[in-house]
Structures are given as structure tokens and as C-alpha cells.
Amino acid sequence: MATSPDSGKMTFHSTLKRKLILSMLLVGILPLLIGLVMAFLQARKEIREVNGASFQALAVETGRKLDLVIKEEEAKTRRITLDPEIIRILEERRDVLLDGDEATFKDQLEHEQEAWIKKDPKFLQPITQGPLAKILEGHYRGTISEKDLSFTVVTRSATRALYITDIMGRLMASIHTKVPYTNKEASWWKGAFNKGIGQTYLENVAFDNLLDTYTFSLSIPIMDSIGYQAIGVLHRAYDAKEFFAPSIDIIGFGKTGHVMLIDSQGIVLSCPLLPTGKRIEDARVIPLVTPRHPGWAPTPSDGHGGTETSIIGFTPLPSVSRITQQSTGTAWHMFVWQSSEELYGPIQNLFTWIAVFGAISFGLLITLGSISAGRIVTPIRRLQAAAKLIGKGELREPIVIKTGDEIEELADEVNRMNQQLESAFKQLKSHLASKTAEVQYLQESTIQI
């Protein structure tokens, strides 16, 4: 099937123009895309590192302050164990128990346990209102302590239990009755008494059925007058949320950024969002945020139920963790978190703007490329049409192209070529006419002869 000249022109024009536009796009858009992608990746990296370093610094500072708060609380509580009257009464109790008969003591303990459960007023009175109880109450309320050594309002309010046991774990004094009478088998008692050697025991957060709340406890051995042997244990239980909240809940940034306290098993001790006692759902996060050194890490989830990647700053509480490691084998860690949506919001906005800018640039390149290609293709088309006319000998006027480049020079060369062809054709016609005249003359001469 024949193709019309116009169709050929359009095919040539469309193909060349398309190639020129495609070449311009490749030359222009590839470096642009590479630059934009590199800028986005670098910005993402910078934001992640800046946020990570900031989260780490916040975790370290908050952890340091909370570490000091707990150390101060431990020091103030330990002062109760140094009270001479408490030591005297417990030494007397020790001597009685060591000199007594074990079977008799066992029977007596059963009766006392029964009386405690039944809340016998005569039995409760010496424990909750006796000399030791009054000393405890005085220290608890700050009436017998120096002002700078008394418990703060916050820790006093967070205290849920404060009591003393003897060398057998039996209750000697308490500020109320919502505590067990026998404690010898309790892990905190075994750890603090430590077979008579004595050591500070800091228990992890757990739900206390008697106190009906999540608590952590501090247990300190009461040593005899020469500091040689433990003669009892002072046990203090705190409402975990109420104790930690003043140091943790007040720290926030952005809409969701906050700090929280967890142990090395991922149990939440205090958090403005998660309930105390809850375990972090994603177990993959726990080892990433509970090393023995401060730092920050990208995590597969945010530790708060979200599944998006996040950045978490962390640090152990050094002094407190030394005690908890000896006590329960776990450490306490400060954890700084912000929702993934808010954390990566600036990056997503940056990506959106980069995509918009890239789309606009792509459109501009197509538009400018089309205009530029048209300016190149149009004079070439004129030259193509002129070449066809020259082939037919029909080009009567010179080609006028003013592009100021090689195409204009090519048009001038085509004009010169056309002039030379016309001159050659004229000479050829003149020569042909001369030869034709000679032939006619010879023919006429031949006829006459």
C-alpha cells in the first residue's frame, strides 16, 4: 500500500521529535531523580540520627535524675534501720527466738497467723500501735526525722506499705494491716535477709493482691548493733505509677513523645500511655532497647502496639540496676519514644514535596523539550521539502532559515547547490539545443543530397 508524502512527513516529524524529547528527558530527568532521591535519603538519615541522639540524651538525663531519686529514697529508708530503739527491740526478739524451742515457736506462729487473719484487736494493737509501729509512723510522717532527711510528700503518698519483720520473717510492726504476717518464704525477704548477711533488695513491679495495685518494693536488712548480723528486714512497698509519675509523666515533647521506665524483661514500670505491669508486645524490641549502655536504635515497631519502624533512645539506671541485678537478675531502663507517624512526619512531608517537585520538573521538561524539539524539527522539515522540490526541479525561491546554527549553514549550502544545479541544467539544455540543431542540419543536408 502506497504511503502519501504527507504521511511520510508526519512520520519523520513525529519520530524525530519524539526522539529529541526522549533524549532531553533522559538527560534532564535522570540526574534530577538521582539528586532528589539522594537528597531524600540523606535527609532521612540526618533526621534519624538527630532524633536518635536527642532521644538518647533525654533518656540519659531523665535516667540520671530518677537514679538519684531512688538512691535518695534508699538512703532515707535505710536511716530507719539505724534507729537504736528498733535495733534494741529486734535484738531482744532474736535472743528470745534463738533460745526458744522450735516446735513451740511453730505452734505459736500458727496461732499468731490465725489471729492476724481474723484481725484480732488485741493481737493487732502491738503490731500497728506498739513502740516499733510508732517509730515507723514517726519516720513515715517525718516527725522524728531531720527536715532534709524526711520523706518527700510524693514518696510518702506513694508508700503503700511499711513494716518490719524479725529474723524469722514474722511481722513485728506495720503502719497498717494490709500486709502478710509471715514473710519468710517471700523472695524479697530471702534476698534482703540473705542468710543473715543482709543486702538491699529492690523488687520488680508486680501486682499486690493485698494492696490491690501494682507495686515495687525496697527491702533493707536491719543489722545488729555491731553491724555483724541481720536481725530483721525493713520492707517498703510503693505504688509504682504514683512513685515514678512525677519524674516521668511530666516529660513530653511533640504530641506523643514521652519517656517511660521498663525492666530488662520488657515490663512497663511507668509510662504515660501504657498501663504499669504490661509487657511490651513486640519481643523483638526488648533486646534492642535494654543493653547495658546508653544509646539509640531503629526498631521494627514502636513498643506501644504500632507496627511501623521507630527510633528509641534508651539508657540503664546504673546505680539502681546494680541493686536489681543482684536482687532479681534484671535491670531498669529508661525508654524514650515518639509515635512513628509523628517521628517520620517531616520525612513524609519532605518526600511528598520532592515527589511534587519531581512531577513539576517532569512536566516542565516535556513542555520545554517539545518546544525545543519543534524548533529543531521545523527547519529540518523545510529542508526536507526543499530537497524534494530540488529533485523535481521545482524550487524557484531560495530557502530562508534563520537559526544561527548548522541548520542555517545547511540551508545556505542547499541554496548554492540548487543554483549550481540550475546553472548546470541551463548549460545542459543549451548544449542539447545546439546538438539538436546540428542533427536537424545534417538530416536536411542528407535529404538534399
What are these regions (language model features)?
Residues F12-S14, K45-I47, F243-I248, T324-Q325, ...:
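Membrane-interface helix-start motif
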Residues S14-K45, A53, A355-I360:
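Extreme N-terminal signal-anchor transmembrane helix of membrane signaling/transducer proteins, especially
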Residues K17, S23, F40, R44, ...:
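Cytoplasmic juxtamembrane amphipathic helix immediately C-terminal to a transmembrane segment
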Residues L41-A75, T81:
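Juxtamembrane membrane-water interface segments immediately C-terminal to a transmembrane helix
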Residues E72-R93, D99-D107, G138-L171, I197-Q199, ...:
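Short N-terminal helix-loop-first-beta-strand/juxtamembrane motif that initiates sensory/input modules
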Residues Q129-I250, D302-T307:
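Extracytoplasmic/periplasmic ligand-binding sensor regions of membrane-associated signaling proteins
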Residues I280-T352:
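Extracellular/periplasmic juxtamembrane segments that couple receptor/chemosensory ectodomains to their
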Residues K388-L389, K402-S434:
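Amphipathic coiled-coil signaling helices used for dimeric signal transmission
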